Amino acid sequence: MFGAELVGRETGGQSTDQPYSYRDSARTWDTVTQSVLKAPGWEDSYAVITIEADKHGNGAHQETVAPSDLRQYAKLANASQILYAPLIFVTKLSIFLLYLRVFASARRGMTYLSIHLLIWFNLAFYLANFFLKIFQCIPRAKIWDSNTSGHCININIPILVTAAINVVSDLLMLCLPIICVWRLQMSIRRKLGISAIFAAGIFGCFASIMRLEVSVRDRNTKDPTYDWYTEITCGILASCLPALPTFFRHFFGKARTMLSRSRTRGSSNRSQDRSLEKATELYTLTYPRGQKHHIITDNRLIDQDRELDDDRTQIFSGPSYAVTEARVEGRTPLGQRAYHGDDTVLNGEDGSGHCRGILKVVEVDVESGPGHPTVKCRCDNW
């Protein structure tokens, strides 16, 4: 592990409990993303520097880093410090421009002036910070090689000033949109929801405050490989949070569409299955004489060549058969007169062959099955 590799080599025999080696960090050429390949920008250079610095002790305590790595790290750290000012300014500028578009589209009023004042103040401050980091040592080689003759400024003073101004700037950025939201004409519930989105920027404020506290407490210590990276990460996350509602609406909208399509397909399949299943239906009819007449329809698949001996039942021939039976309770079955498909009349009479006269006519539609014609059955009670 890291301790076993480093002890006795260049750390002066110091041991460490760190469970990994900073030299095993991801290399620059291992980190290739589609977005970087599509649209690389100058800000991507900061990521390249950071990834390269990881294998020279970035994020590890300085006492655990080899001297040769510290020299290389100092070069990369100075490059990242130079980029720090424009990077943090661009992060804040993106938030300020969002505020202008949302809250000051009319280009007048106190909100518009306040946002522009913050933009120009941050521009001036971070521009000065940019040149300060470039010329912090003369010659510049003294930044990473203390044996080089020359002089350097006390870098702790700019760090403290930068941390303090970042805290004030971040708090103003946090309060400004919330004040604007509560001046809008909308429901309390919606105001709370929008305020919660912008209030997520409090993570950046916490990072600035913690950086200021650590800078004041450890101003006499030197551990440049471990500090001041949290603030930039939190700032970038905070600047992306206002876009989360749009992302979630897009994501959940597609999820609802896919779920709806799945349910529609499932419903269609179940409907088709139910069309293949026909339950027995019982119709009860009351006649003027007080007699109950039951017409029972039931799906039965019967071979065409099969003959039924029961003369009480008429069979409709075809690919599948629907049996219709009519009888009066307590009496012998009544005759039936049925119209089947091509309106062919099937005569049904009582046992004597005499038709008693029609008391009630009932028409029943029986579907033989999917793809087969509907059978119309007309039952006459004599």
UniProtKB/Swiss-Prot annotation:
Region annotation Disordered: where it falls in the sequence: 1-22
Short name of any one Pfam family annotated for the protein: Fung_rhodopsin
Keyword annotations: Glycoprotein, Membrane, Transmembrane, Transmembrane helix
Subcellular localization: Membrane
GO cellular component: membrane
InterPro entries named among the record's database cross-references: Rhodopsin_dom_fungi, SAT4-like
Bilayer topology term: Multi-pass membrane protein
Positions annotated as glycosylated: 78, 147, 269
Transmembrane region(s): 80-100, 112-132, 159-179, 192-212, 228-248
Organism domain of life: Eukaryota
The family this protein is said to belong to: Belongs to the SAT4 family.
Protein name per Swiss-Prot or TrEMBL: SAT4 family membrane protein
Species: Emericella nidulans (strain FGSC A4 / ATCC 38163 / CBS 112.46 / NRRL 194 / M139)
